Amino acid sequence: MDRAKFIFVTGGVLSSLGKGISSSSIATLLQHCNYQVSILKIDPYINIDPGTMSPLEHGEVFVTSDGAETDLDIGHYERFLNRNLTRLNNFTTGQIFSSVIENERKGEYLGKTIQIVPHVTDEIKRRIKSAAKGLDFLIVEVGGTVGDMEGMFYLEAIRQLKLELGNEKVINVHVTLIPYIQTTNELKTKPTQHSVQELRRLGVTPQIILARSPKPLDKELKKKIALSCDVEQDSVIVATDTKSIYACPILFLQEGILTPIARRFNLNKLHPKMAAWNTLVEKIIAPKHKVKIGFVGKYLSLKESYKSLIEALIHAGAHLDTQVNIEWLDSENFNEKTDLEGVDAILVPGGFGERGIEGKICAIQRARLEKLPFLGICLGMQLAIVEFCRNVLGLKGANSTEFNQRCEYPVVYLIEDFMDQNHQKQVRTYNSPLGGTMRLGEYECEIMPNSLLEKAYKKPNIKERHRHRYEINPKYRQEWENKGLKVVGFGANHLIEAIELEDHPFFVGVQFHPEFTSRLQSPNPIILDFIKSALHKS
């Protein structure tokens, strides 16, 4: 931790300005200067983690290799940095409070009155320092907006850290909005000025202003912001909208963000090697080919629920010089008459609950019968089994016990005890609490030879991430396989991890979530081959 330098990223004016992408972009530039870099996300909500939050409330829950259910921004960090992060890279107010209360119960505070300062702020600082071990730089994104009640003690902890570590070890970057008033054709800086004033009132002074704006800022506006916010003019970085989030590091580099960073940290001039990155971004922005993927989901009112999967399709497309267009198909309304004209492949993602299930099953049946390339992920694979049992084997009562505990043919069921990734026995029942009771994190999968999965991964054993409670019931396996639906992937205790259909261009189901390991620089192999199959069909 001694060598680590810290860049804290806060947000002002309003939420959803792109602090996560900004943090990822800064980290990417520093990483391409051959530094050891990581990112930490602080979430100011009181939930322990987002695991039990509705996707429509929070967006996607991203699962790390060590089984943590985290904020979707952790997914951005992994995809930009092309490295695995852990539960150390995300914490919530709920976790902070739980730790402090647990320590108090153990008597670790020697009978003192427990207060926000110093006990809560000390726990925050401890976690930040712990995440910085072995690094040159730790970028810390603070969720929420300056002025929110929930974020006050995080800003206090940042103030204290800067005092403890010294100015040469800490930079504060404030992401803010420069709104454009169309009627007067003006960009307004007043919201930024007020946001910085509030931040400074709380004891934190920004050294870099990252100004989100729909239009470029001229020198006079930059000078005005610099003067009113007490930063140097080259520390006002304009972040206009880009055609791809992966173009943001290039934009920041062009805007000169590394100049104030190097100056503040007493570093030589920074020269990131971005040629390979630039090539991939060019293929995203101006691809030679196009495919259309029918995405059958039920959380379509907030597409951030499927963020990693959307990005995984973009990664595969970039490596195939292909624009992947998504045709959003609401599973609640999908039926045998739904128009699939121009759709090159069908994707059925993971999910929870009974709503929209029959529409997904119908989409799978059409992909099977119409020879459309198909990829089913987690629940998507489970429903492929249900569809096959109902419509090929004639088991009309086939279902998952998630939706009907008394179904006639429970082809998907709840395993009440299993070994977790640490080889510890876990027990779960239909009455178990929802939080943290799933099969979570990275597990090994043995791939059968001569399968589409082996062709994609090019090795007999892989590791992929899971997030589910229900498993495929092996009782009916022989009946499926006699009809051409083969099991091609096995996990520990012979759990069924992957299936594929014979005599079909591409019909694959996987119990794991391949999207969680896809990166711009290294797309997930099975998603890459899925897009290849769609491209061949188109």
From Swiss-Prot:
<keyword id="KW-0547">Nucleotide-binding</keyword>
<comment type="similarity">
    <text>Belongs to the CTP synthase family.</text>
</comment>
<feature type="binding site">
    <location>
        <position position="224"/>
    </location>
    <ligand>
        <name>UTP</name>
    </ligand>
</feature>
<feature type="region of interest" description="Amidoligase domain">
    <location>
        <begin position="1"/>
        <end position="267"/>
    </location>
</feature>
<dbReference type="GO" id="GO:0042802">
    <property type="term" value="F:identical protein binding"/>
</dbReference>
<feature type="binding site">
    <location>
        <begin position="188"/>
        <end position="193"/>
    </location>
    <ligand>
        <name>CTP</name>
    </ligand>
</feature>
<keyword id="KW-0436">Ligase</keyword>
<feature type="active site" description="Nucleophile; for glutamine hydrolysis">
    <location>
        <position position="378"/>
    </location>
</feature>
<feature type="binding site">
    <location>
        <position position="224"/>
    </location>
    <ligand>
        <name>CTP</name>
    </ligand>
</feature>
<feature type="binding site">
    <location>
        <position position="141"/>
    </location>
    <ligand>
        <name>Mg(2+)</name>
    </ligand>
</feature>
<comment type="pathway">
    <text>Pyrimidine metabolism; CTP biosynthesis via de novo pathway; CTP from UDP: step 2/2.</text>
</comment>
<keyword id="KW-0479">Metal-binding</keyword>
<feature type="binding site">
    <location>
        <position position="351"/>
    </location>
    <ligand>
        <name>L-glutamine</name>
    </ligand>
</feature>
<dbReference type="GO" id="GO:0004359">
    <property type="term" value="F:glutaminase activity"/>
</dbReference>
<feature type="binding site">
    <location>
        <position position="73"/>
    </location>
    <ligand>
        <name>ATP</name>
    </ligand>
</feature>
<feature type="binding site">
    <location>
        <begin position="188"/>
        <end position="193"/>
    </location>
    <ligand>
        <name>UTP</name>
    </ligand>
</feature>
<feature type="binding site">
    <location>
        <position position="402"/>
    </location>
    <ligand>
        <name>L-glutamine</name>
    </ligand>
</feature>
<feature type="binding site">
    <location>
        <position position="15"/>
    </location>
    <ligand>
        <name>CTP</name>
    </ligand>
</feature>
<feature type="binding site">
    <location>
        <begin position="16"/>
        <end position="21"/>
    </location>
    <ligand>
        <name>ATP</name>
    </ligand>
</feature>
<dbReference type="InterPro" id="IPR027417">
    <property type="entry name" value="P-loop_NTPase"/>
</dbReference>
<dbReference type="InterPro" id="IPR017926">
    <property type="entry name" value="GATASE"/>
</dbReference>
<feature type="domain" description="Glutamine amidotransferase type-1">
    <location>
        <begin position="292"/>
        <end position="538"/>
    </location>
</feature>
<keyword id="KW-0460">Magnesium</keyword>
<keyword id="KW-0315">Glutamine amidotransferase</keyword>
<comment type="subunit">
    <text>Homotetramer.</text>
</comment>
<feature type="active site">
    <location>
        <position position="515"/>
    </location>
</feature>
<dbReference type="Pfam" id="PF06418">
    <property type="entry name" value="CTP_synth_N"/>
</dbReference>
<feature type="binding site">
    <location>
        <position position="469"/>
    </location>
    <ligand>
        <name>L-glutamine</name>
    </ligand>
</feature>
<dbReference type="InterPro" id="IPR029062">
    <property type="entry name" value="Class_I_gatase-like"/>
</dbReference>
<dbReference type="GO" id="GO:0003883">
    <property type="term" value="F:CTP synthase activity"/>
</dbReference>
<feature type="binding site">
    <location>
        <begin position="379"/>
        <end position="382"/>
    </location>
    <ligand>
        <name>L-glutamine</name>
    </ligand>
</feature>
<dbReference type="InterPro" id="IPR017456">
    <property type="entry name" value="CTP_synthase_N"/>
</dbReference>
<feature type="binding site">
    <location>
        <begin position="148"/>
        <end position="150"/>
    </location>
    <ligand>
        <name>CTP</name>
    </ligand>
</feature>
<keyword id="KW-0067">ATP-binding</keyword>
<dbReference type="GO" id="GO:0005829">
    <property type="term" value="C:cytosol"/>
</dbReference>
<dbReference type="GO" id="GO:0019856">
    <property type="term" value="P:pyrimidine nucleobase biosynthetic process"/>
</dbReference>
<feature type="binding site">
    <location>
        <position position="15"/>
    </location>
    <ligand>
        <name>UTP</name>
    </ligand>
</feature>
<dbReference type="GO" id="GO:0005524">
    <property type="term" value="F:ATP binding"/>
</dbReference>
<dbReference type="GO" id="GO:0044210">
    <property type="term" value="P:'de novo' CTP biosynthetic process"/>
</dbReference>
<protein>
    <recommendedName>
        <fullName>CTP synthase</fullName>
        <ecNumber>6.3.4.2</ecNumber>
    </recommendedName>
</protein>
<feature type="active site">
    <location>
        <position position="513"/>
    </location>
</feature>
<comment type="function">
    <text>Catalyzes the ATP-dependent amination of UTP to CTP with either L-glutamine or ammonia as the source of nitrogen. Regulates intracellular CTP levels through interactions with the four ribonucleotide triphosphates.</text>
</comment>
